[in-house]
């Protein structure tokens, strides 16, 4: 059985999944991006399995090379966008920790509210 057409089709599907993931990351649809990740991983595993069964010809390798480049470029862009998002989340977590520390430090004032007085003289 000739698996070469199936291998080529599997690569096309991987390109589509890669483009979807890049679009989701660009649009900051993080939940959807995470949900689509498993389908992407499965597609990569299918290609690995098919590649074991098929020894792609030089011609087929030349046809697949641009797809591989596109997939790698998309993956790099997704990683960059994810890093930006992780930095944003780290900043928010840091701000939350500071707020918690401030509330903890000033919340233990024995029930007294510290406020400036209007007439100091």
Curated annotation (Swiss-Prot):
GO cellular component, one term: cytosol
Entry-linked InterPro entries: FliT
One of the protein's GO biological processes: bacterial-type flagellum organization
Any Pfam family matching the protein: FliT
Ranges where the record places region FliD binding: 60-98
Keyword Cell membrane: no
Compartment(s) of residence: Cytoplasm, Cytosol
Region (Required for homodimerization): 1-50
Keywords for this protein: Bacterial flagellum biogenesis, Chaperone, Cytoplasm, Repressor, Transcription, Transcription regulation
Function text: Dual-function protein that regulates the transcription of class 2 flagellar operons and that also acts as an export chaperone for the filament-capping protein FliD. As a transcriptional regulator, acts as an anti-FlhDC factor; it directly binds FlhC, thus inhibiting the binding of the FlhC/FlhD complex to class 2 promoters, resulting in decreased expression of class 2 flagellar operons. As a chaperone, effects FliD transition to the membrane by preventing its premature polymerization, and by directing it to the export apparatus.
Known partners and oligomeric status: Homodimer. Interacts with FliD and FlhC.
Family in the record: Belongs to the FliT family.
The name this protein goes by in its record: Flagellar protein FliT
Source species of the chain: Escherichia coli (strain K12)
């Amino acid at each position: 059985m000739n698996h070469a057409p199936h291998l080529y089709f599997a690569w096309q599907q991987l390109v589509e999944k890669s483009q979807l993931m890049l679009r989701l990351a660009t649009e900051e649809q993080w939940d959807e991006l995470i949900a689509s990740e498993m389908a992407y991983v499965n597609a990569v595993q299918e290609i690995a399995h098919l590649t074991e069964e098929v020894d792609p010809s030089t011609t087929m390798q030349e046809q697949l090379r641009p797809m591989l480049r596109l997939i790698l470029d998309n993956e790099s862009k997704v990683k960059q966008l994810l890093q930006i998002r992780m930095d944003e989340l780290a900043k928010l977590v840091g701000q939350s920790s500071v707020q918690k520390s401030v509330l903890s430090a000033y919340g233990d004032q024995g029930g007294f509210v510290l406020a400036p007085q209007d007439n100091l003289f």
